[in-house]
Amino acid sequence: MKSILIPGTDDSRMRYHDLPGDGTPLVVIHGLGCASSCDYPAVASDPVLTGRRMLLVDLLGSGFSDRPQQFGYTVADHAACVVALVEQLDLPAVDLFGHSMGGAIAIEAAMRLQGRLRRLVVGEPNLVPGGGVFSRRLAANPEAAYVAAGHRAVTESSRKDGGDVWAASMAVSAPLAVYRAATSLVAGSDPSWRDLLMGLDVPRSLIVGERSLPYADTEGLPEAGVSVRIVAAAGHSMAVENPSGLAKAISDSLA
């Protein structure tokens, strides 16, 4: 695993897997309470993506990355870290894939990387203010209460409900990071991530799990030039439920 120093933090490092390959590197950004080091090895090793250089990023506060206390953990803050990765590695061109919260982060990063961005792919991203069911549930708590006990309770509840993989990622995520990211998703952005996605002048694709259909957020996107692709036999957690199907959807989006 490799790391970069994040500017403006107290020597905090963001860690990532750099899987060797050819062509334009694909930067992979995970969702809330997740980690790319956990969710995406099976996707990255699928035959349709092998041979492509891929950077599997663990955002600050998640996975193997550091957990600075004096960091905002907003979508914009995380996007700045993704940009820092691209700049520090001196990558002349990149593709971005982000899932859920990572989709919103990828959209924000895309706005800052337009000179280097080749293609943008998002999987069931947060596009409008208000967050999702999970982020709203977390953000409804006071920060101190969530950090003290709420995070542990949510993690244990998920484990008991059969969400073992996600619960494991949550267990190693910083409670403060998860809470602040959730409140950022609820707050949204202005312009909205949806408007930013529709306005970008690069090839864009949005991936939806079949079990998430009907999916209202796709309305109007094809007319704006955003391709919509479906992953069969999967819902929101598509990287876990059908990694091969997600790999194929990403590969097709980058073709």
List each language-model region with its residue ranges.
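Conserved HGGG/HGGXW glycine-rich cap/lid loop of the alpha/beta-hydrolase fold
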Residues: 9-64
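Gly/Ala-rich beta-loop-alpha elbow adjacent to hydrolase catalytic centers
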Residues: 98, 102, 106
